[in-house]
Amino acid sequence: MLSTLIRRLSRALLWFVAGSIVLVLVFRWVPPPGTALMVERKVQSWVNGEPIDLQRDWEPWENISDELKVAVIAGEDQKFASHWGFDLPAIQAALAHNERGGNIRGASTLTQQVAKNLFLWSGRSWFRKGLEAWFTALIELFWSKERILEVYLNSAEWGKGVFGAQAAARYHFGVDASRLSRQQAAQLAAVLPSPIKWSASRPSAYVASRAGWIRRQMSQLGGPSYLMQLDSSRKL
């Protein structure tokens, strides 16, 4: 009985490993049709009796404002070009902060956020964190940095039912994602920690202050020229 159970578990694990690798490889080239977060939001809206229509239009890398690309990096993950999916010093600092009490601080890189939003459910269990680490490693192994950021920008939540840069640009500013200004990009990046609570088009004092900080960080990073550091040639 025990040996049979072990064989079945081993077989299931092998299928999971193989399936997840294939899925990540497919999404290296094919735009994901949706994300786990989008499904979760849709289900939540049904449960709450307030169904929502999801807004999302996939835009390729070249059709997204460079200002938004840099703004997201400046606000969310300034070591994006150099790390391999995990910012260990930031993780250690977050753990130390959380142990001292107070508000829980995260340290997720853009790659980790892609893994979580694309494949996983919300939560803080160690099991989910383990799956997040697995998918993060696969994404970093098989995708270029440009591809990671492209998928992130097309999957990020920017309001109730609003997903991706194009839908966000249209919803908040009435423009295409390719025409976002630096200020608009900074405001979109400023709400990413809590896009349902905060609005990019109607910024609170906090969001306005954070957007100003992000603009300064964008300048320190070198502006759009920073994107030249996203070395796609290091990928398989």
UniProtKB/Swiss-Prot annotation:
Pathway: Cell wall biogenesis; peptidoglycan biosynthesis. It is an enzyme of class 2 (transferase). Its EC number is 2.4.99.28. The keyword Secreted does not apply. It is found in: Cell inner membrane. It is a single-pass membrane protein. Belongs to the glycosyltransferase 51 family. This is Biosynthetic peptidoglycan transglycosylase. It comes from Pseudomonas putida (strain ATCC 47054 / DSM 6125 / CFBP 8728 / NCIMB 11950 / KT2440). The gene is mtgA.
